[in-house]
């Protein structure tokens, strides 16, 4: 008889502005994986099942079963800077986790809500959305520190063979001990994207930080190679050209579209502000006519 797996988390609610930042980050490069940390809170949401009972001519609702489910609410994300770029894996240093915890404490003071680091995300460019055995082991390590910790994966730059169109897939998972084995296996967690009319200030700041972080990563890689003493002049010139080319590509693929999106949002906000101002003037005119 199979032993049922007890899930530490039953669902994840990912706010749409945080989802947007994750998606932009995942689409920023198709050569290596990118990563970040999720900030939010873990709540026990009440779930009840009820049935109707008849008492004479009255109908009343009688609770049949009331329990709670653990839901991770992700409000914002922190984009992490990669010290080592790899196409098949990412690593989060203890220093980055500590800095993210400090940022979560700052957000908790601003919002008055119990914010903390509740998960991590990374991209899978050109490969399946399902976590690798390394991802599953990494997730298990994080869950040793926090049972409510979740992992998100964004699979991008993949093409539908039938329609020849690009697709982006995402999933959420945790790790559980495999039966009759010392290894871990993944368990999928339902993830729901919660719509938002506007983008929050914290997520907006994270989106703006993306080009800066990508530029810093390129600078670090260039300085690391340029510091080697055995390189000849031609190799150094070539490396400088590659560095310049990569920065220009980032400006074209990331900074330019981001700036255009921000300008469009600003124009929409200004248009909405003008409409509200016009509506206010009309209401004030009606109010004066009633006096």
Swiss-Prot record:
Residues of the MPN domain: 12-179
Question: Could you say which enzyme class this protein belongs to?
Answer: hydrolase
Q: Where is this motif: JAMM motif?
A: 122-135
Where is Zn(2+) bound in this sequence? 122, 124, 135
Q: Which cofactor does it need?
A: Zn(2+)
Post-translational modification Phosphoserine, affected residues: 233
* Molecular functions per Gene Ontology: cysteine-type deubiquitinase activity; enzyme regulator activity; K63-linked deubiquitinase activity; metal ion binding; metal-dependent deubiquitinase activity; metallopeptidase activity; polyubiquitin modification-dependent protein binding
Tell me the keywords, alphabetical order: Acetylation, Cell cycle, Cell division, Chromatin regulator, Cytoplasm, Cytoskeleton, DNA damage, DNA repair, Hydrolase, Metal-binding, Metalloprotease, Mitosis, Nucleus, Phosphoprotein, Protease, Ubl conjugation pathway, Zinc
Which InterPro entries does the protein's record reference? BRCC36_C, JAMM/MPN+_dom, JAMM_MPN+_peptidase_M67A, MPN, MPN_BRCC36
Q: Which Pfam families match?
A: BRCC36_C (PF18110), JAB (PF01398)
Entry-linked Gene3D superfamilies: Cytidine Deaminase, domain 2
Please provide one cellular component term from the Gene Ontology annotations of this protein.
Answer: spindle pole
Q: Which SUPFAM superfamilies match?
A: JAB1/MPN domain (SSF102712)
Family to which this protein belongs:
Belongs to the peptidase M67A family. BRCC36 subfamily.
* Protein role: Metalloprotease that specifically cleaves 'Lys-63'-linked polyubiquitin chains. Does not have activity toward 'Lys-48'-linked polyubiquitin chains. Component of the BRCA1-A complex, a complex that specifically recognizes 'Lys-63'-linked ubiquitinated histones H2A and H2AX at DNA lesions sites, leading to target the BRCA1-BARD1 heterodimer to sites of DNA damage at double-strand breaks (DSBs). In the BRCA1-A complex, it specifically removes 'Lys-63'-linked ubiquitin on histones H2A and H2AX, antagonizing the RNF8-dependent ubiquitination at double-strand breaks (DSBs).
Under what name is this protein listed? Answer: Lys-63-specific deubiquitinase BRCC36
Q: Which organism is it from?
A: Rattus norvegicus
């Amino acid at each position: 008889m199979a032993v049922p797996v007890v899930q530490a988390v039953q669902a994840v609610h990912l706010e749409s502005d945080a989802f947007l930042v994750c998606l932009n980050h995942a689409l920023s490069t198709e050569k290596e994986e990118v990563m970040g940390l999720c900030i939010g809170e873990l709540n026990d949401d009440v779930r009840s099942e009820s049935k109707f009972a008849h008492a004479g001519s009255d109908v009343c609702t009688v609770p049949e079963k009331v329990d709670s489910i653990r839901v991770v609410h992700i409000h914002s994300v922190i984009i992490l800077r990669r010290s080592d770029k790899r196409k098949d894996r990412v690593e989060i240093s203890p220093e980055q986790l500590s800095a993210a915890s400090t940022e979560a404490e700052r957000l908790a003071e601003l919002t008055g809500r119990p914010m903390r680091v509740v998960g991590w995300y990374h991209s899978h460019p050109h490969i399946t959305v399902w976590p690798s055995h390394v991802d599953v082991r990494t997730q298990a390590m994080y869950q040793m520190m926090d049972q409510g910790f979740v992992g998100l994966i964004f699979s991008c730059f993949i093409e539908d063979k039938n329609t020849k169109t690009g697709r982006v897939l995402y999933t959420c998972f945790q790790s559980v001990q495999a039966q009759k084995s010392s290894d871990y296996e993944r368990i999928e967690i339902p993830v729901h994207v919660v719509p938002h009319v506007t983008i929050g200030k914290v997520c907006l700041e994270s989106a703006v930080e993306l080009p800066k972080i990508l530029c810093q990563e390129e600078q670090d890689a260039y300085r690391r190679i340029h510091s080697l003493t055995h390189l000849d002049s031609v190799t150094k010139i070539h490396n400088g050209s590659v560095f310049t080319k990569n920065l220009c590509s980032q400006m074209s693929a990331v900074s330019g579209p981001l700036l255009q999106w921000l300008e469009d949002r600003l124009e929409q906000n200004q248009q909405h502000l003008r409409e509200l101002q016009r509506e206010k003037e009309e209401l004030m005119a009606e109010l004066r006519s009633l006096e």
